[in-house]
Amino acid sequence: ADLDKAVEGAMLAKFRNIGQACTAANRFLVQRSVVEDFTQRVTERVQAMKVGRGTEEGVQIGPLIDDRAVDKAKTLVGDAVERGATVTTGGSPVEGPGTFFEPTVVADVQPGSDILREEIFGPVLAIIPFDDEDDAVRLANDTEYGLVSYVFTESFARGQRMIDKLETGMMGLNVGVVSNAAAPFGGWKQSGLGREG
């Protein structure tokens, strides 16, 4: 995949509306051969994000919906770290008033981590390395949710295979935003049945 496009897509897919959207990506499966470079690039972008009130100039990360959302993000990050993941930036609630959580990158997330099983609904980007296409599909489908997936590849044939193999209702190919008023909206598994639009 074009790493620049993949990083840009990841930023859009994760941090739009602070990750508090049903179409926000939760798990980022990255091929092992480029995972270090991808992690570094995403970490640099996330470190540069400004946190604060939406009325402040240049703010990119605002508050989460409530204290429970902050606690959930903190708990998911903590569990991932206990199981062997590394926080490359962020990882904690922001000190002071409000329900702010630092934009966070968690790398080398291990199988069995809660962050891989639950919807995050917060500014936490979890990176899982994979070895080959079959490994990526297995990891991607290992969830009870299936609303949307985002695939970045330079291979049209691989993109077509992913459409058939990934258990999601929608898929963005080389884009970080999949919602479109002109396209049907819907998911699989616990993300709903059927389509709207």
Task: Report the location of each language-model feature.
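Conserved C-terminal structural/oligomerization subdomain of aldehyde/semialdehyde dehydrogenase
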Residues: A1, M11, K50, P93, ...
